[in-house]
Every structure is written in C-alpha cells, then in structure tokens.
Amino acid sequence: MAPRTLWSCYLCCLLTAAAGAASYPPRGFSLYTGSSGALSPGGPQAQIAPRPASRHRNWCAYVVTRTVSCVLEDGVETYVKYQPCAWGQPQCPQSIMYRRFLRPRYRVAYKTVTDMEWRCCQGYGGDDCAESPAPALGPASSTPRPLARPARPNLSGSSAGSPLSGLGGEGPGESEKVQQLEEQVQSLTKELQGLRGVLQGLSGRLAEDVQRAVETAFNGRQQPADAAARPGVHETLNEIQHQLQLLDTRVSTHDQELGHLNNHHGGSSSSGGSRAPAPASAPPGPSEELLRQLEQRLQESCSVCLAGLDGFRRQQQEDRERLRAMEKLLASVEERQRHLAGLAVGRRPPQECCSPELGRRLAELERRLDVVAGSVTVLSGRRGTELGGAAGQGGHPPGYTSLASRLSRLEDRFNSTLGPSEEQEESWPGAPGGLSHWLPAARGRLEQLGGLLANVSGELGGRLDLLEEQVAGAMQACGQLCSGAPGEQDSQVSEILSALERRVLDSEGQLRLVGSGLHTVEAAGEARQATLEGLQEVVGRLQDRVDAQDETAAEFTLRLNLTAARLGQLEGLLQAHGDEGCGACGGVQEELGRLRDGVERCSCPLLPPRGPGAGPGVGGPSRGPLDGFSVFGGSSGSALQALQGELSEVILSFSSLNDSLNELQTTVEGQGADLADLGATKDRIISEINRLQQEATEHATESEERFRGLEEGQAQAGQCPSLEGRLGRLEGVCERLDTVAGGLQGLREGLSRHVAGLWAGLRETNTTSQMQAALLEKLVGGQAGLGRRLGALNSSLQLLEDRLHQLSLKDLTGPAGEAGPPGPPGLQGPPGPAGPPGSPGKDGQEGPIGPPGPQGEQGVEGAPAAPVPQVAFSAALSLPRSEPGTVPFDRVLLNDGGYYDPETGVFTAPLAGRYLLSAVLTGHRHEKVEAVLSRSNQGVARVDSGGYEPEGLENKPVAESQPSPGTLGVFSLILPLQAGDTVCVDLVMGQLAHSEEPLTIFSGALLYGDPELEHA
C-alpha cells in the first residue's frame, strides 16, 4: 500500500508542477511598484506613475504552496529469521531454529507548506524576464486613457478582453504543436484512467486478501510467521511502478515542450511589437483558448488524482476499521459461544413445559397417524390378495369409519386445545405499554382463525359426503366389473389396482400434509400460551412492585407529617425560650445598674485606718469579695445558670432536629434511587411487552399466510376434476384397511393369549427357582457346619503333631552293652580323589627348525557378497510453488531404487552411508528465494538468494523495502545418513520458477556405505 500511495502522490506533484508552469497563481506581489495588492492585468501599462528603472524590475514575488514528503517512524515491527545456534552458543547441534527480531517501521507523510518564489511579473517573459509586453497601436497620446476592466490574465500576460493575443500572430506550426499537446494530454488522461482501473483491481485484491484473512481467523488457522507475500501483489506493484515511470517521463517531456512554447510565444510577442504594434484590446486567439483548456484539464486531472488518493486513503482506513470491528465481533462471538456452552452445561430442561392434557392429545394424534401409515404399508404389501378378495365381495366391510368422522375428531381436538388458551387470554389483566390493546386484537385474530378452521371443516365435510356417494357408486361398478369371468378382465383389474395404489400414496401424502399443518397450528397455540403465561408473570411482578411502591410512598408521607409536626413543636419551644432569655437579660441589666449606684453612694472605708506605729499586720488579714458577688450579685447568677441549662436543652433539641433532617434527607435520596430503579424496570418491562407484542403480531401474520396458502391449496384441489374419483377409491381402500385392522386385532388377541401363557410359564419358573434357592441355602448352611468340623479336625491334628514332636525330643536309648568279638576284614574301597598338581619343572632346550610342510587343501568357496543397492535420484519442479513448506519436485528425471517420492518431495535413505545431495533453486525476477535443506526434520543448510542480512537494529532505516535482484540458490554438500533418514527442501520465502525445461532441480546419490553408522 505504501509504494502505491507514494507513486500516486509523486504523479500528482508532477501534474501540479505542469499546471503551475502553464498558469501562474494569481497571488503575486511586486517589490518595485510600491503596491501591496495583486498586480493589475494590464501589467505596467495599467499604472499611471512610471516604474523606477531597475535591473530586477520585471521579477515579482509569488506565494506558492508546495507538498513536501518526509519519512516518519511508525512504530516497531517484528520479523522472524533463521539462525543455526541460540544466542551466545558458538557450538550447538545443527537444527532449524528461528528467532524473532524487532526493527523500526517507517511511513511517508505529506504536508502542504507555503513558500515565496520569484517569477516574472505579469506581462513579462523570457529566461531573465527581459521581454516586455507589446506597446499599444496608434500614435502615443499625452492624455491618459481609461483603464481597462481587470480580467483573468493568460499565459502571454495580456488581458482577456484585448482583441488580439499577445503572441504576435499564430502560425501553422504552433497550431500543430497545440493540437499535438492536446492529443498527448488526452492520451495521458486515458493512461490515468487505466492506472485508476489497475488501482481499483489492486484494492479488490486487497479486499479479497482481507476476506481470506478473516476466514482464516474464523477457521482457527494462522499464517506462518515466515510466510512470503502473494506474488501477484508484487507483480502488480512492479507494473504500477513501471507505468508511473513512463508517465513521469512523458510529463517531463510535456513540461519541456510547454516551456519552449512559452519562450517562443514571448519572442513572437516582442518581435511582433517591433513590426506592427497590436491594439490595446485584442481578442483571445485559438492558441490561447487551447492552452487554457489544457490548463483546465491538467488541473482537473490533478484534482481527480488527489481525490482518488483521498478515496484510497479513506478506503484503507475503512478497511482497517472493518478489520478491527471484525476482530471485536470475533472476540464477542467466541465469548458468546463460551457463555452459551456454560449455560448449556449448567442448564436443565424444565420438568413440565406443557400441560399433560395437551401432551396426551398430541400423543394420541401421533399414534393414529402412525396407525394410518402402518395400515397403508401393510396394504401395499398385501394388495394382491386383500384387494382382490374385497373387490370380489363387492360390499362394505364391518367396522367402516369414514374419513369425515376422523377429520371431525381432529377438528374437535384442535378446538379443545385452543380453548384453554382463549380462556387464559380472556382472564388476562390489562398491562401497561399497550398490552391491553394487544390482547383484544390477538383474541380477534384467534377468532378469525377459528372461523377459517370451521369453514375449512365444513367444506371438507361436504366434500367427504360427496366422496362417500361416489365411493358407493365406485364399489357397485367394481362389483359389476369383477362379476364376469376372471380371465377376461385381468388387464383392467391390474390397471385399476395400480391406479388405486398411486392414489392411495397421493392420499397418504395429503393426509400427512394436513397432519403437519395441524401439528404446526398446535405448536403455535402452545407457543402463544407460553407467551401469555410469561406476560402474566411479568405483570404479576410489576403489580407487586407497584404495591410495594405504594406502601413505601405511604410510609414516606407519614414520616414527612411526623417531621413537620416535630419541627413545629421545636419552633414553638425555641421561641418561648428566646422570650424568657431576653426577659432574664433585662432583669440582670437593671440589677447591675442598682449595684453600680450603691457602690458610688458608699463613702465609708471598708478597712480601719492605720496608725503611724502600726505594723503591716495590725489591721488583720484583708477580706476578699463574697462568693457569688465578684461579677454578678444577688439572684442574677442563678438566673444565668437556669438560662444556660435551657440553652443547652435548646442546643440538644437542634442537634436532634439536625439528625432527623439528615435521616430524612437520606431516606429521600434512597426513595429517589428506588424510583429511578422502578422507572428503569418499568421501561424494561414495557420494552419486553412490546417485543412480545411484535412477536405475537408476526406469528399471527404468519398463521394468516399459512391458512391463506391452505385455502389456495383447497381451491386448487377443488378445481382438480380427478380428485373426487381418487378420494372415492381412497375410501374403498380405507374400508379394506379396516378389514386389515380387524385381522391385526385378532392377531393381537392371539399374541395376548401367547403372552399370558408365557407369563404363566414364567411364574412356574419363578416357583421352581425359589425351591432351588431354598435347597442352595441349605447346602450353604451345611458347608458352614463342615467348615467348623474341619477346623476342629485341624486343631486335633495340631495337638497330635505337638505330642509327636515332644516324643521325638526325648532320649529313648538305653545303657551301653558289653563289647562283642572283632568281625572279618571288609572289601577294598574305591580309589580316592586326585591330589593337587605339583610345581612345574624346568624348561628344556629348544630343538631345530623343521622342514616346510606340504601345501594345504583348497578351502570351501565363500558366500557371495551382499548386493549394494543402487541409490540415485534427480527431480525437477514443473508446477508453481509459492506456499511455504516442503517443495514437491514432481518431474522425476532419475530415480534408481525408487527411494524418492515425487508426491511429497522427500528422499528416504535405504542404508547408512555417505550421500551427495545438491539442489538448484531458481526464483522469479526481483524476488528473493529463501529455503532450508532438512534432514529428518532438522535444518542442515540454508540458502538466501537476496544475500546476507545482518541482525540488529543498527542498520540504516529506509522508507520502503527495495526489490531484491533475482539470483540462484544452490545446495551442494555430502551428508552422513542412517537407514531411514529423510531429506527434503523446505521453502521459507519466495516463489520458485517452473517450466518444462529444468530450472529448479533436486538431486542426490549414494557414494559408499558406512557400517559404523548402523552401529552408532
């Protein structure tokens, strides 16, 4: 995306420069005319005051805007690179290891800046702005002419209202050049449109890649870290770069031609002025109009290009936002799936979701439908005998039940099912949020549905009556048909039977459709009943909350009244205490005044006078003021103490009043929060009721559509002429089915008798088993007694063994007797064993060397040597390969022994030895190839056609990655392999070249075997 944006902006800059060369910006300021505004269209002639002579008087400063680009750091990206060893281990086992590195990511930013540029003033041209505009025609007049109306200046500097252009004449060569320039601009516009189409195609591919990435993320597959980019994107980018380079070259050529044309126009104007002065108001020429159109087209192309760039940027931003939104959506979906899985694990189905009466009716209906289906199946199996016998009898079988009675029973059951739901709807109270308005509408819709069902049942009853009459006529016709000789009407009977079979199948399908429709209606009634029950529960909870709110409001009003009464009491008490305190203060002031007057009137000394010889202690100790009369006197102290006590009571009253007010404020705040919660709960209940109302409306609409479809089907069935005949034959088949049902009933009774006999035999078997169990219990008891007896016998044997052991320990030998006479000599015994060997003797002298012996016999021929297998292979790649993984070299050039698998690209060593392995990997141009040679899933060697890239962040950062030149990657090494080792080439990055001629080859051969590797 970055190269595409960079080249597009570069193209827009070139087009802007070309437009600027054709038309100068209107903001120009002359530094020598003394005017601060823009220059007049007439140039120097429009000014009355003469311009000062200066060398640079024809140059003006213009404020221009430029778009500059800069390289900014855009975060850090990670990339994976292969390394043979871990970090800091010089010697390590040769295995494939990948390491993740960080490197800065850069982006190209664009900014519009203003700059001052020196250009030729309006009306001047040339390389050094020395070419002045052409003077006016006619003799010079001393009186100044009125200034012309300002107009938009053209390229030559003359005003648009002049009758002649300032080019000094237009020749055929100039018109041809202008026409060529116009054609070139048109071709450039077409190329820009083609480039826009290519960019749109690239954006489409980007959208496909984004969609594929999202699908991969949803499916749980991840792209490998070292996977290469798509080759189609690189090829498209290379093509875009090539086209942009061509456009750059053409724009430069056009810019040069425009410069030459401007210079030529300037020279022509100067020469034309010397030959024939042009009038002051010359009309614009066709060349000027063409140049103006060229300027407009260039500006439009630039604006379109900039708008396209902005659109691509916005589209890229939208794609990024969509990716983020899809990631968030994926995360929310996964979270929801986990939540649903947890709910499914912890959730148990309700014990009773439906009424037992409704379940019983549904079970009975299903049972009857199963009976009908089974009867039809039995009929199709025995149609040869049963139908023939029934047709020969020519009458109705016993137990005949018409289809009308069955449909009427189904209708009664459906009405009985809808009855409780209608009663619940009638007894349902009105609810807020439009529930009271919805319930009458729903009741009306249910009544309409009931009327429609009644109409349908009436029409079906009438048609069934007609069908009964037609069935009777058909049975009589069938009896007349079957009354003849059996050999004459065999073909007609077979046709009738086949037609009956087809019609029976059709009737069965129609009955199943009717049953499914009734089942759907019953399910809808159940759903509506469940919805009504849920609404009733919600309204009940809302009523409880409203009652609780009423109680809370009443309590709140009572507490407000009590607080108001208490406030009134406190105000009265405070006013009374205030009056009493003010009166006490007045009395205290009067008493203080009287005391002050008494002190002033008192002239007698309080102490006796001292004599001249009296000491300091003659007069006795001085007396202090009386207690209670130091500040206040009389009863004023007690009054103040009483006033202080009353004020303390008032303060305590105010404190309790403040506490009560705080509690009241807290209660009011809690009531506000409760009211807010109740409001939110009410809003949720109203929204839930509205949702349920909408669902009920949708369900009613759907039911109306279904009944409308049922009516249309009924009308279509009524228009069918052969339906009555089919139903008549179906009625006859139903009569025969009743006969079959009677036979099945007899079979059931016989089976019941057999089952009763089996139960009797089972009871006898149980009795015999009980007797045998009693005998087995006796045997088990006898075995228990036998065990006790065996234990006693074992103890007796143990006692006997102990006694025998004691007897064996006793010495039973008697005293020694007298010695007897000597006996005769015995026989000679056997020889004794050999003694130990003696010490070796001394070595004798060595004898002389004997003569050579005769030649020995020829040995037996040895076994033949083990055959060495011939192992060699060579394979090439003929199919495109760009995905990372093992490269399957499918075109086999040589495969001695068949140890190379072309489908997987893996070579398996048959025996241990030294093998020569080589591979030549050819990549696409401007795209490097990176691969690894693996031995038994372990990397042995690595090749990178782009060259060695140092590891680390100290490399010089670049704004964009340059395409690497396409080179070869070659493997050639000798490896020791054991029997069963596998060797393959794993592609890490890039795209391999494929063709009929071998470009990418993988080869190997056995050099010699090594038995030591087998024992290693």
UniProtKB/Swiss-Prot annotation:
Any Gene Ontology biological process: negative regulation of collagen fibril organization
- Collagen-like domain location: 814-864
UniProt GO MF annotations: extracellular matrix constituent conferring elasticity; identical protein binding; integrin binding involved in cell-matrix adhesion; molecular adaptor activity
> What is the residue range of the signal peptide feature?
1-21
Q: Which InterPro entries match?
A: C1q_dom, Collagen, Collagen/C1q_domain, EMI_domain, Tumour_necrosis_fac-like_dom
GO cellular component, as recorded: collagen trimer; collagen-containing extracellular matrix; EMILIN complex; extracellular exosome; extracellular region; extracellular space; integrin alpha4-beta1 complex
Q: Which residues form a coiled coil?
A: 216-256, 356-420, 576-603, 685-752, 835-857
Give the compositionally biased regions (Low complexity).
139-165, 266-279
Q: Which UniProt keywords apply?
A: Cell adhesion, Coiled coil, Collagen, Disease variant, Disulfide bond, Extracellular matrix, Glycoprotein, Neurodegeneration, Neuropathy, Secreted, Signal
Instruction: Report disulfide bridges, numbered on this chain.
Output: 60-121, 85-92, 120-129
Q: Where is this region: Disordered?
A: 135-182, 257-288, 383-402, 416-435, 811-863, 942-961
Domain C1q: residue ranges:
866-1013
Q: Does the keyword Acetylation feature in the UniProt annotation? A: no
Comp. bias (Gly residues): 386-397
Q: Where is the composition biased (Pro residues)?
A: 821-839
Primary localization class, coarse: secreted
Q: Which residues are glycosylated?
A: 154, 415, 455, 561, 658, 766, 794
Its transmembrane ranges are none
Pfam families, A to Z: C1q, Collagen, EMI
Beyond the main fields, what else does the record say? Answer: Its deposition precedes the appearance of elastin and is simultaneous with that of fibrillin 1.
Q: How does it assemble?
A: Homotrimer associated through a moderately stable interaction of the C-terminal globular C1q domains, allowing the nucleation of the triple helix and then a further quaternary assembly to higher-order polymers via intermolecular disulfide bonds. Interacts with EMILIN2. Interacts with EFEMP2; this interaction promotes the incorporation of EFEMP2 into the extracellular matrix.
According to its UniProt entry, the function of this protein is described as: Involved in elastic and collagen fibers formation. It is required for EFEMP2 deposition into the extracellular matrix, and collagen network assembly and cross-linking via protein-lysine 6-oxidase/LOX activity. May be responsible for anchoring smooth muscle cells to elastic fibers, and may be involved in the processes that regulate vessel assembly. Has cell adhesive capacity.
Put simply, this protein is called EMILIN-1
Q: Which species expresses this protein natively?
A: Homo sapiens (Human)
- Tell me the lineage of the source organism: Eukaryota, Metazoa, Chordata, Craniata, Vertebrata
